[in-house]
């Protein structure tokens, strides 16, 4: 009943972390919204910018240190102290990417292209861009604009809008 009275019309997602699991949470939710016909805007800030930076977007890693939810294949526990060992993060990241490829999960770039093709809008944070000394040309070509936080919030205004932080 509530769906008929107040359907979701717009979703604004803020991606502030650059790990595989955080970036993919953003991309999966954004793509799902686009597929449902919901107006979709993504704002990449701080380390989330890695997902839309040409030099970084194919090199995202899994956060192994301090991740109590981390599991090994088959669901076996992964002691967080193992994440500090040299090569573990790279190995876990490679395994995760391999598993994702085997089950046809799109790459970061493919997801961004799908979201953009479906009408989703992708933005970068001006403050984080300045902080990391990035320029618009450093970003994936589908980034619509570099905005301040205030500018992004203006785009997120209106009834039946959700703002999601990942």
Whereabouts are the PLM-identified features?
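Glycine-rich, aromatic-bearing surface loops/beta-hairpins
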Residues: 124, 137-140, 144-166
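Mid-chain, well-packed structural core segment of small domains
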Residues: 86-136
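A glycine-rich helix N-cap at a beta->alpha junction
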Residues: 60-96, 100, 104
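N-terminal beta-loop-helix "entrance" segment that forms/cooperates
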Residues: 48-61
């Amino acid at each position: 009943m509530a769906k008929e009275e107040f359907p979701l019309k717009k979703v604004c997602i803020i991606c502030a972390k650059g790990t595989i699991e955080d970036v993919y949470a953003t991309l999966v939710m954004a793509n799902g919204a686009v597929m449902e016909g919901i107006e979709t805007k993504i704002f990449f800030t701080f380390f989330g910018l890695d997902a839309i930076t040409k030099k970084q977007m194919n090199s995202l890693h899994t956060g192994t240190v301090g991740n109590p939810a981390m599991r090994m294949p088959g669901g076996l526990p992964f002691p967080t102290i193992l994440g500090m060992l040299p090569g573990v993060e790279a190995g876990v990241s490679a395994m995760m990417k391999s598993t994702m490829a085997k089950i046809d999960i799109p790459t970061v770039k493919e997801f961004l292209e799908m979201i953009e093709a479906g009408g989703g809008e992708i933005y970068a944070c001006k403050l984080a861009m300045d902080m990391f000394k990035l320029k618009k040309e450093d970003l994936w070509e589908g980034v619509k604009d570099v905005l301040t936080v205030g500018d992004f919030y203006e785009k997120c205004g209106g009834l039946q809008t959700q703002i999601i932080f990942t």
